[in-house]
């Protein structure tokens, strides 16, 4: 079990690394599920890229049903097709799909460890919240073009992603109401309290 918070009509639960469950009403969305052994059945699973701590077939199997839709980039989709329950939908940066009543837009997310196209972020509306999950990325210029974001889920761990200071600069580009740090304290460092102090009044930081 992870730590939970509720923002508007959406309950968010953060597990390890960048793994989240988001639920509004009966619609359950997981993003990058990792090291899960169960949970509410998924309507939708979003996978940002194929690294083991983001695309975990065992965790997907723990929450997927035959009715689940899995949205992932092409490399992940190829690996998952026919190996997990549910229907797999392949996307690339710039694509928008609507599945299970949720409109999902694949957006830019990249750095030296994750070349452009290897990782995608996801912007999606669930309930009354517009959510952005960055996957593994640094601050990139495209972030200023994502439109209105209520809740941003941003990596802060450094090494493979942006660290606290760069993530705080990303907050100023994205302009979310709420930001939840992720991708820290597992395979990398990262201090969520330091990140919160750097964000200051620019957004409400919720640490899970």
Q: Which stretches of residues belong to each language-model region?
A:
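Core dinuclear metal-dependent hydrolase active-site scaffold
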Residues: 1-40, 90-147, 162, 208
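Active-site metal-binding motif and surrounding structural segment of the metallo-beta-lactamase
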Residues: 33-79, 148-153
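Redox-cofactor binding/interface segments in oxidoreductases and associated redox assembly factors
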Residues: 46-47, 105-107, 154, 181
């Amino acid at each position: 079990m992870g730590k939970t918070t509720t923002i508007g009509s959406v309950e968010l639960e953060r597990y390890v690394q960048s793994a989240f469950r988001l639920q509004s009403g009966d619609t359950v969305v997981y993003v990058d599920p990792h090291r899960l052994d169960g949970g509410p059945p998924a309507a939708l699973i979003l996978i940002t890229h194929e690294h083991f701590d983001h695309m975990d077939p065992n965790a997907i199997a723990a929450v997927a049903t035959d009715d689940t839709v899995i949205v992932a980039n092409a490399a992940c989709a190829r690996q998952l097709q026919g190996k997990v329950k549910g229907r797999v939908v392949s996307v690339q940066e710039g694509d928008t799909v609507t599945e299970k009543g949720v409109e999902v837009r694949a957006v830019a997310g990249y750095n030296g460890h994750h070349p452009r196209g290897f990782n995608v972020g996801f912007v999606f509306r669930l309930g009354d919240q517009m959510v952005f999950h960055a996957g593994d990325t640094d601050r990139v210029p495209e972030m200023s073009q994502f439109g209105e974001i209520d809740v941003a889920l941003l990596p802060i761990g450094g090494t493979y992603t942006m660290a606290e200071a760069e993530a705080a600069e990303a907050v100023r580009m994205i302009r979310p109401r709420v930001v939840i740090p992720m991708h820290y304290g597992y395979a990398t460092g990262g201090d969520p309290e330091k990140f919160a102090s750097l964000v200051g009044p620019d957004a409400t930081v919720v640490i899970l």
